[in-house]
């Protein structure tokens, strides 16, 4: 498995301050704003509970149903949804003309005042030697501190698109939750099953409570979802109403975007948000995390 990204300065500071070793992730992704005390529309916290609103959103590199690139529109959808942690799929980073070579992950983080980590599943040479690398993948936005992160490349046969599993340990008012974000292969069940198998292995190693966000490109009755829900709970089944279709945005007919959690996380409400900002609709879920610094053990 790939190593975690952990800046040395943060470790040294922690050792000097505490004279001990913290046996977990001890870093954050690049901050893009201070952690707020609260947010309008976010779930209300009561004593002993740690509510967390999360969302999964395939943003189609900012191109909406009108075929127009409009990243501000994506930002407004996220903002209006009130999610404190958001998993984004199909995110460009200096990728090309289709997204005007913008680092979309950083742009959205700065626009929303959130922290961000980005997982590059495609990492291509620039068109000119002095330009940034052209990248495409997934991102996690968070209003809470990100203490560490990594991106794992998933199985890919020859000729297939490289997919990945981005994960971040997020500190939510003293509790840690491990947030995963993925986007599985769209045209091969065999590939998705192989990718799900590796995801289950990685998720199963988590000491913390787990939230898996993503465009899984599989419907609820599929073998892929049957496999992953042996380990994680489908929050739409627990807290959603209706079919929960997320694709496509113009004529929703399939539920392929998910929020899945470990059994110690409670889903209180789930909704699909109407939007024309992408070809997918975002799914937003209110969760309650368990107490304790590290969640499950």
What are these regions (language model features)?
Residues 2-114, 118-130, 291-294:
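N-terminal, active-site-proximal structural segment of metallo-dependent hydrolase catalytic domains
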Residues 43-54, 134, 138, 142-147, ...:
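Beta-strand-turn-beta hairpins that frame and shape the catalytic cleft
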Residues 52-59, 74-100, 141, 168, ...:
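Active-site beta-strand/loop signature of hydrolases that rely on acidic residues for catalysis
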Residues 59-63, 91-95, 121-126, 146-147, ...:
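Solvent-exposed loop/turn segments at secondary-structure junctions
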Residues 67, 97-101, 115-140, 161, ...:
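Active site of divalent-metal-dependent phosphoester/diester hydrolases
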Residues 69, 73-76, 103, 107, ...:
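Extracytoplasmic/secreted proteins, especially bacterial periplasmic and envelope-associated proteins
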Residues 107-115, 171, 202, 224-231:
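Alpha-helical structural signal in soluble globular domains
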Residues 271, 295-297:
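Low-complexity, Gly/Ser/Thr/Pro-rich intrinsically disordered linker/tail segments
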